[in-house]
């Protein structure tokens, strides 16, 4: 069985824990004084319509009496490591998705720690007892079902879906609960008469593929409880990535370049925070028909430079577009071949590092500002179009 454990409003919950006077109040991390965007919002703040990626000025208008606090990303990372250490007490098979969520496969530790339900309860209680933080747990035989279960249980929830209860659990849910279905996809499916997951499950596979192509096959598999993905151990240790599925398919190169710029910044920042260098850059590219492609390039020298990562990613995008000019549903950038950033480096003989030093200073300043004001408080001009669109249509 697989557990999906997701910390509830993680950044905001940490602030409420550390400052008892904030408990029970609407707390907004980032976006203070109307600058930048909201990084996280407590559930009390969400009742006023505030959510992550919202402009701070909008959040203030929605809830003027909210407590706006500056983000402390290094502190959140430290707390996240403590959460992950608790996960590893119950199973070595842990796949972190971010600081505040992970998949856990507990199939091999049942004899040691009890049933999956007992393990899930113990994990949640241990996090509450040792870290004084709330977490939601979903348990299911499939990864995507465990994720849905934890989402449905939020906040501070616990939902278990037995192996023989997957169909009963999924059938009444809206199609938007399926992985890969955004607002545009939901509208398209509803227009075709598919409102619940059961509507997709009972549809003939060939008929669905004729309507929706490979995307239809993907949805049919999920609706019928078919998900062959395994929990991947040490996912973040082997690579760092960032990707976005678009509310509307993109086709113009200007918009795609803006997304690549945004993804490069976010991925490079995570790389530097982890004190790693990357020697491989991979661009992931999903077409409107759900076919997915990727192109990778190995670097001669490992890097953590945003500019270097961006330049390679843009070149990979141009190569991909020349082969695959159709509209794009998803773009992603992942960094692999990671090495320790603190390890000794080969020095240049003739001073070529001057430009690298300038780029490094820009990255350091950008990271410092992001830590103080939120990750969207400063970004490259080339990212502007995507950040504006993202803030207008945020992902909750």
Swiss-Prot record:
One of its GO terms (biological process) is error-prone translesion synthesis. Mg(2+) binds at residues 6, 100. Its EC number is 2.7.7.7. GO terms for molecular function: damaged DNA binding; DNA-directed DNA polymerase activity; magnesium ion binding. Its cofactor is Mg(2+). Keywords: Cytoplasm, DNA damage, DNA repair, DNA replication, DNA-binding, DNA-directed DNA polymerase, Magnesium, Metal-binding, Mutator protein, Nucleotidyltransferase, Transferase. It catalyses: DNA(n) + a 2'-deoxyribonucleoside 5'-triphosphate = DNA(n+1) + diphosphate. The record marks 11 as: Substrate discrimination. Binds 2 magnesium ions per subunit. Poorly processive, error-prone DNA polymerase involved in untargeted mutagenesis. Copies undamaged DNA at stalled replication forks, which arise in vivo from mismatched or misaligned primer ends. These misaligned primers can be extended by PolIV. Exhibits no 3'-5' exonuclease (proofreading) activity. May be involved in translesional synthesis, in conjunction with the beta clamp from PolIII. Belongs to the DNA polymerase type-Y family. Monomer. This is DNA polymerase IV. It comes from Rhodopirellula baltica (strain DSM 10527 / NCIMB 13988 / SH1). The gene is dinB.
